[in-house]
From Swiss-Prot:
The active site is at R168, K193, H261, R264, H287, Y296 (o-(3'-phospho-dna)-tyrosine intermediate). Site-specific tyrosine recombinase, which acts by catalyzing the cutting and rejoining of the recombining DNA molecules. The XerC-XerD complex is essential to convert dimers of the bacterial chromosome into monomers to permit their segregation at cell division. It also contributes to the segregational stability of plasmids. InterPro entries: CB, DNA_brk_join_enz, Integrase-like_cat_sf, Integrase_catalytic, Integrase_recombinase_N, Integrase_SAM-like_N, Tyrosine_recombinase_XerC/XerD, Tyrosine_recombinase_XerCD. Forms a cyclic heterotetrameric complex composed of two molecules of XerC and two molecules of XerD. Disulfide bonds: none annotated. One of its GO terms (cellular component) is cytoplasm. The keyword Cell cycle applies. It comes from the Bacteria. The lineage of its organism: Bacteria, Pseudomonadati, Pseudomonadota, Alphaproteobacteria, Hyphomicrobiales. The gene is xerC. Its main location: cytoplasm. It is found in: Cytoplasm. This is Tyrosine recombinase XerC. GO terms for molecular function: DNA binding; tyrosine-based site-specific recombinase activity. Pfam families: Phage_int_SAM_1, Phage_integrase.
Length: 315
């Protein structure tokens, strides 16, 4: 049965029905989230509204089959004039391309050229590092907001791994139950993106935070289990740590930029500020390319001036 959205969009009956079928397939076959489905419905509706004005009449499957890349560029330019940013434009184009590919697979149109158009580049937004003092306050066990002592210790241990070892949150939450069980270990092997392994040094503060958590955790932390657990013993999810970080921001008066990932960024930035070289930091972060590390660390002006004063022949 057709939904109301079919009658609200400016399109001929054949295109409206095909679009409705596409939306249903996204929900049943691809199992996209409700938010993504809502965004795709809205973005394609805006696209069809644009085409109605662009062509002078509501489009049908025939007009969709005659689309050119220039038409999509005009749509993006129109959205940009309305104030849409690069991220919104990219998402909107993704929805339109998904619809076009669906119509092609169904043999309804041939829009290979238009569906191959690339999304506009999105500017990279980097997390802002915390100051060293703020980072220490965030990872302090005494400063955690959780009422349960073992959960407070758990949160402190996770955050300490992000700041003290530069781990991604997924890497910290994926540690096995026997990780860091040897207090004399000076390093551990981490498997990161692309199944690449790297060696990460272990500071005494990291050992201490994990040991305090182990002593209080009521669940089995043997080798076959995960190290970090949720309140009922299941896997600890990143959203929980992000929520705890939100509480810490409010309690400590930190800006919204103080996120779990910002702790990893702070790890790199503070190492660089104390004289660490980019190649070593690249290895510690697990970046495949040095250029990623150069962008990620965001060398501050003071550090650049110090290097300039020490190394430039005319300084």
């Amino acid at each position: 049965m057709a939904t109301n959205s079919e009658f609200l969009i400016p399109a001929r009956a054949d295109l409206a029905a095909a679009r409705e079928e596409w939306l249903k397939s996204l929900k049943t076959m691809r199992r996209l989230s409700d938010n993504t489905l809502i965004a795709y419905e809205r973005d394609t509706r805006q696209f069809l509204q644009f085409l109605t004005g662009h062509l002078g009449e509501p489009p049908s499957l025939k007009e969709i089959g005659n689309l050119r890349i220039a038409d999509l560029r005009s749509f993006l330019a129109n959205r940009r004039n309305d104030g849409a940013g690069a991220r919104t434009l990219g998402r909107g184009l993704a929805g339109v391309r998904s619809l076009l590919r669906h119509l092609e697979k169904r043999g309804l149109v041939n829009a290979a050229g238009a569906s191959a158009m690339r999304a506009p580049r999105q500017p990279k937004s980097l997390p802002k590092p915390l100051t060293a003092d703020d980072a220490r306050r965030v990872v302090s066990a005494d400063g955690q907001m959780a009422e349960e002592p073992w959960i407070a210790a758990r949160n402190a241990a996770v955050l300490t791994l992000l700041y003290g070892c530069g781990l991604r949150i997924s890497e910290a939450l994926g540690l096995s139950g026997d990780a860091l069980s040897d207090p004399s270990a000076r390093s551990m092997t981490i498997t990161g993106k692309g199944s690449k392994t790297r060696l990460v040094p272990l500071l005494p503060a990291v050992h201490k935070a994990v040991a305090q958590y182990r002593a209080l955790c009521p669940f089995d932390l043997s080798a076959g289990q995960l190290l970090f657990r949720g309140a009922k013993g299941g896997p600890l999810h990143a959203a929980i740590i992000q929520r705890e970080m939100q509480k810490l921001r409010a309690g400590l008066g930190l800006p919204d930029s103080a996120t779990p990932h910002a702790l990893r960024h702070s790890f790199a930035t503070h190492l660089l500020g104390r004289g660490g070289d980019l190649r070593t930091i690249q290895e510690l972060l697990g970046h495949a390319s040095l250029s990623t590390t150069q962008v990620y660390t965001g060398v501050d002006t003071q550090r650049l001036l110090e290097v300039y004063d020490k190394t430039h022949p005319r300084a």
